[in-house]
Amino acid sequence: FHMVFTGNPGTGKTTVARLVAKIYKKLGFLSKGQLIETDRSGLVAGYVGQTAGKVTDVVNSALGGILFIDEAYALARKGMDNDFGHEAIDTLVKLMEDHRDDLVVIVAGYTDEMHDFLTSNPGLISRFNKYIDFPDYTDDELMAILEMNAKRQGYAVTDEAKQVVRGMLTGMTLSERMDFGNARGMRNTLEK
């Protein structure tokens, strides 16, 4: 049941991971159904021998639920042979096997970087059998997200504001769009 979620920031990967935890709990695949979110900083320590313990602690807290590792590719930095990220991956692979009956691991990140992560350890790629890509939202979808978030907060988006936001979206370069953050960017736009 381990999964790989790929896509840009703000496309719903964490939100879907939370929903998967609830669904798997209701279906009886998981005993507790909690979602433990972490990233490289939650798994990698600064000194030899500390990383394996840190990974073990995080995995133990996720037993019965889902361990969601955001930006998992950061564990497999190329050209960093003395980096402890590879130790974290090695430990994770072993623990995924040891606890395969009551732990789901979901790793998430950018598509290209996730390929590098999955091929960084011979046993890693075979542990994941479900791959879900989260495409960027269209401008129309982003506008709907803006309006939905505004409504939740008791606001209505005026036609003038819609025009300004749509103009902002259509005027973005590809690089700016990558940094914008999709739904997260719309939430931030509303808060401004």
Protein language model annotation of sequence segments:
Residues 1-33, 57-60, 128:
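Walker A/P-loop
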Residues 3, 36-38, 67-68, 105:
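Hydrophobic positions in the central parallel beta-sheet of the AAA+
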Residues 14, 38, 55, 70, ...:
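Conserved RecA-like P-loop NTPase ATPase core
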Residues 18, 73-80, 89-135, 140-143, ...:
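Canonical AAA+ ATPase core
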Residues 27-32, 116-119, 134-179:
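Conserved C-terminal "switch" segment of AAA+ ATPases
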Residues 31-62:
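Short glycine-rich substrate-engagement loop in P-loop NTPases that contacts/grips substrate
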Residues 39, 62-82:
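Conserved P-loop NTPase "ATPase switch" module shared by AAA+ and STAND
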Residues 173-192:
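The conserved phosphate-sensing helix
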